[in-house]
């Protein structure tokens, strides 16, 4: 069981909800600065006087077993090994340990960062997680983790800090009076009463980012009859922008949760529901789930008071300023079957991570909101399932009524893992390699959770097979249009401008690269319990910008931590076979598969910076085109991909603000329109070079 240290939990709450209170209040964890000449006495050791270690020094300290990965600028992003001679017993010691490797990781004098939390795992390793700040703002994707072994020595670190940012100018905050004026402009109605004595500096998680702001309290003219929420918190950014508002039950200067979501669970009485749910295949499952009774309105809620989970309507919460229309019945009967099975599986996913002492998505019991009836702003149902961040104090998940994804524990646990990884990494860069890695972790942990729960008989590591809609195969990725190695058929290269037309850089396609390795470890003899420890510990090690080289290093690090070093060679072999180590661009260009040939052409730099893509078709029996796959120009403005030998038709889609413009490959080359397309003959082991597009 993983133990998250309670005193660091307070720091996490501060990061997510209250960074700076009014004068007189202090933090458990103040910000930290590497020492500079202007901030220390001459007799104290200064950053510039600290002897900087080299990779060779660290190798000697680590008995020749240290491992390093780097970003393009040459700074270390993952370090596995001892880099500090002193003992690390506190987060302050962890900060001190960085002085000697500042040049390796790009920490310049004046680098500003703060401790988010600390935790100790079952093996006795302690992890200190920091985030970087600049000019009063938390930098996106900037996370540093210091790992300490059971004896108190530095065991390694991972870092996605922005290197050499320097010292920011002092930031000016808007006044309390100005914040109140902005709120009055947004809510001029006279029935709002303002509690000016309690206006204060704060921070909230908004659109998955920590935003520092002023919080203004007013009365709540539209107080719910179901919950006692007499006040409203209004959030105004330091730049003077009205951000959002939420109802709350109390106000005051001692705030540990700016959104007061815990208040919704107060006053409810626990209950249970037992009943039958009809699954997609017509089979019946008996389930028992917690519910709750609200004496104020006489309704039963689909809610778990112990785990702090509630179920509410997606549209109201997302399109009506966070309104909470909870799912209720008057008699604890008649619950929607899809709601029930989805809720039930989220409880199972919650409990799996809770057994590792990760309660909720973060280990600090952030309340969970399962929003049902997913739709767009016009009310059209969306065929999806998702985790969409922490919003208004809730860890939010979306569920649809037009699919049965909630019946599949691997799909539900996939989404739950998105929340866990986002919290562990302190952010997610959901694009290209980092996005595919994020998706892969969700697939891997989702499948492990499902298999360990006995919720499937699948041995091929499929995703979604228990809801009648299998989406992926981790044992044979090509079956569901995914690559098994870098440059394989269906592989999507990194793109300059990730977006919806290119799946944010093929995040739902290339995720098979890592999940296929997880399956390979399983087939090599690693048990599900061992896989769970290996991958979960690596989640705690990686950062939002960790690429495949970093993940490889962190998996080897995790193997050391968990006593699984006998699998180190297997991990190395599988990563090598997948082409995930080193220059992946060149690996993709040179990739080959028996029975396949290559198609290649270039586009202009301007087109490569857009969202363009190429669709590939074969000819059906009726002569119509049958879609096979799509590829996009890569970061080098090249389109280069493998196809099985055969005849194909290609259509280039140019994305503009007005829509899509299509250019087919004709006998004379690329031209507007899709009639009269030429067949491109792909031959085994050969490359077909097509005309470039500008």
Protein language model regions, located:
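Zymogen propeptides/activation segments of proteases
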Residues: 25-412, 419-694
